Amino acid sequence: NLAGERFPDWATERDRERVLGAVREALSKEAPELSMVPVSGIEAQERDILCESHLISKDLLKRAAGGGMAVARDGTVCVMVNEEDHLRIQGFAQGLDMQSAWRYADELDTRLERRLTYAWSPRLGYLTACPSNVGTGLRAGVMLHLLGLRLLGEIEAVVSALERMRLLVRGIGGEGSEAAGQIYQVSNMDTLGIDEAGIIRRVTRICAEVVRQEYNARVRLLQESPLVLVDCLARSLSVLQNARLLTTAEALEFLSALRLGAAMGLCTRLKVADVDSLILMMQPGHLQKGLGTAMTSDERDEMRADFLSRKVARVKLKC
């Protein structure tokens, strides 16, 4: 947050517009590769696409005045202006490469701080609208696909253990969302009393252990419960190849199973990256943009089923 300015939820429209202008000016001078776009200037379909890509939040889209966003062309860093706080700087990286994600965000933060004065307390650190973010103001989050643990009935125990270690466990859409497709977002709960490097090391270490447990669960599925695994894959592939209507949630559940099969080498003509692409492309905004037309919910369900059936038509199981 900027020093001397009201937090967004307490600010007037004029206050938020002033903050947006200050951030736009700072970006133009220190990070010209990122161009600021006001929320009011983003079309409805593009809003859906940005949300589905996890670049902006639904809360930001509710800002009729003073909301803004800027994203790098390669998608490694994104800035939200006047969401819950004046600035939300996000860094993204694939895999468990938390250091790169942190570096992208930290480098931009350092450049912006040359032009902006942040609200900071010697006793508390960075001041934020939500007390749970006070201190470093850092959330280090990892997306994990844990279908193997789910099929073995062990996911609840893992989630409980993570929460006891003061980690937040949410669905793919973040706070308040369900873990559709057994994709979980795990992040630090504490931001006060520990520095940024310590947060990143801790989240990385614990998530690496969860990944190890998921790999172990997949091995045990093959060795001890192969019928459970094969049935899950066969049912999902059959529905995706033959369904005439598919909601977003249904498609994600079935694609989750194919992602597991691809990762375990049990599907022909299918890689994990292919499934990740399909998971994004079957979302409402991406689907409509890809097909070049706006559709009703029922029309999207029909076109989603047709789109996915064509994409997985040649996929077969090796088991």
Model regions and ranges:
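Long, Pro/Ser/Thr-rich low-complexity/intrinsically disordered regulatory tracts in eukaryotic proteins
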Residues: 1-123, 138, 150-152, 157-319
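Conserved phosphate/anionic-ligand binding catalytic regions in large, soluble enzymes, centered on
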Residues: 125-144
